[in-house]
From Swiss-Prot:
<dbReference type="Pfam" id="PF15032">
    <property type="entry name" value="DUF4529"/>
</dbReference>
<dbReference type="InterPro" id="IPR027836">
    <property type="entry name" value="DUF4529"/>
</dbReference>
<feature type="compositionally biased region" description="Polar residues">
    <location>
        <begin position="134"/>
        <end position="160"/>
    </location>
</feature>
<feature type="region of interest" description="Disordered">
    <location>
        <begin position="133"/>
        <end position="160"/>
    </location>
</feature>
<protein>
    <recommendedName>
        <fullName>Uncharacterized protein C16orf46 homolog</fullName>
    </recommendedName>
</protein>
<dbReference type="GO" id="GO:0005654">
    <property type="term" value="C:nucleoplasm"/>
</dbReference>
<feature type="region of interest" description="Disordered">
    <location>
        <begin position="194"/>
        <end position="213"/>
    </location>
</feature>
<feature type="region of interest" description="Disordered">
    <location>
        <begin position="12"/>
        <end position="32"/>
    </location>
</feature>
<dbReference type="GO" id="GO:0005829">
    <property type="term" value="C:cytosol"/>
</dbReference>
Length: 409
């Protein structure tokens, strides 16, 4: 037992000694100067900045869209690579393609940059001619367009504007077109040698006419769409004549209306000694001239309206024109009776005006009331003459009563 206890105590002592020895031998870092501490801190900050930049670059590369790579690769590939035909096309004859049928659409349009610029008028004429040709020649195929070039200078200039700017592969009748949209070219394309030689042999002997497509296109546009002609002066003269003929009877009627209104005003002013107004027949103010067997509706309505305005009575003589009731030939009978009554009334009115014109008229309220009553009397008498469709308009009466400023009614 004693031996075991001694051994345990010995082991504990040895362990404690080892721990103390390690603590004494551990290196202690002491910075004697402050500059060394600041430099150490700056180094740590620089390392942290570098790590942050590297982390940011890693995130940018992870979320990249590939735009930078595409931009860097533009110098290696052609910008018009998407327009090139997939299959290699064999070189055909000179008239079966503009440049052998081996160029793309974009390059073929750029190859014409050496042409001289044209004026705006020529461009407008070419566009008009091309639109007219497209509307008339949509059903034509490309084979007919190219085969018709050898027919003559007229057909050559016509077919020159219908060229299709697409790559074609001609093997007998088989064709493989990569694009299904046909582009109608409205530019000046260089004509082949065969066409230019045939076009130069025109009857006039000038080769420039066969080579200049704008002139031929402009001429064709004029043929397809002729210029508008100015309207002849005969139409204006005829319209003026018709207006004069139409308004001539109305002017005559207006002149007659003025004369009759003056006569009616003079007749109303004349009053006898007893203070009673003279009795005028209703038909004395009505005047019908040039009665036709079947008068037109427009002239009849105008005469009736003029008669209603000519009469001094303030109620309507005849109804307004209505589209429901057509013109009846039986109205001539009533017009004839009005004409007879008008002649009799004028004669009696003239005789009375000559005999009594000395006394001034009265303008009192009683005189106006008696005048209105006397105006209503012939209204009742004449209502028996007209047919039933005219009665509703005859029952209306309008009397004008002037109000004096001294007394209020």
């Amino acid at each position: 037992m004693d031996v075991c206890e001694e051994s345990e105590t010995f082991l504990e002592n040895t362990e404690n000694q080892k721990i103390e020895a390690t603590e004494e031998t551990a290196p202690t870092l002491h910075c004697p100067d402050e500059k060394s501490e600041r430099s150490h801190v700056c180094c740590l900050l620089g390392v942290s900045d570098l790590t942050l930049e590297e982390d940011g670059r890693a995130s940018e590369c992870a979320i990249s869209t590939g735009w930078e790579e595409a931009v860097h690769g533009w110098g290696r590939t052609s910008p018009t690579a998407c327009i090139w035909s997939k299959k290699k096309v064999k070189r055909g004859r000179a008239r079966e393609g503009t440049n052998g049928g081996n160029d793309c659409l974009f390059c073929m349009s750029l190859s014409q940059g050496s042409l001289e610029p044209r004026s705006l008028l020529e461009v407008g004429k070419l566009e008009a001619g091309a639109e007219a040709e497209v509307s008339t020649q949509k059903s034509w195929s490309s084979e007919k367009n190219w085969s018709g070039l050898s027919q003559g200078p007229g057909t050559a200039s016509r077919e020159q504007s219908n060229k299709l700017c697409i790559p074609t592969d001609v093997h007998g009748e088989k064709k493989s077109l990569q694009l299904k949209e046909f582009i109608w070219c409205m530019e000046e394309w260089p004509m082949p040698e065969t066409v230019s030689s045939k076009a130069g042999r025109n009857p006039s002997g000038s080769p420039e006419q066969g080579l200049s497509t704008p002139d031929s296109l402009a001429a064709k546009a004029l043929v397809v769409l002729p210029p508008l002609k100015s309207s002849p002066h005969n139409l204006d003269v005829l319209s003026k004549k018709s207006r004069n003929i139409f308004w001539q009877p109305e002017e005559k009627v207006l002149r007659v209306e003025k004369d009759d209104c003056m006569a009616c005003a003079d007749g109303l002013k004349g009053v006898d000694g007893k203070g009673e107004k003279r009795h005028f027949e209703l038909a004395s103010h009505v005047k019908v001239t040039n009665v036709l067997p079947f008068p037109p509706t427009a002239a009849q309505t105008h005469l009736l309206s003029a008669e209603s305005q000519r009469c001094c009575l303030h109620w309507s003589l005849l109804p307004q024109k209505s589209t429901v009731f057509p013109p009846n030939p039986s109205d001539i009978h009533y017009l004839a009776t009005l004409q007879v009554l008008g002649q009799q009334g004028k004669q009696s009115c003239r005789t009375r005006l000559k005999t009594k014109d000395t006394k001034p008229p009265r303008t009192t309220a009683k005189h106006i009331i008696t005048e209105a009553k006397q105006q209503n009397r012939p209204h009742v008498l004449e209502s028996k003459v007209f047919p039933k469709p005219l009665l509703p308009s005859l029952t209306v009466s309008r009397v004008v009563i002037p109000v004096s400023t001294h007394r209020v009614l």
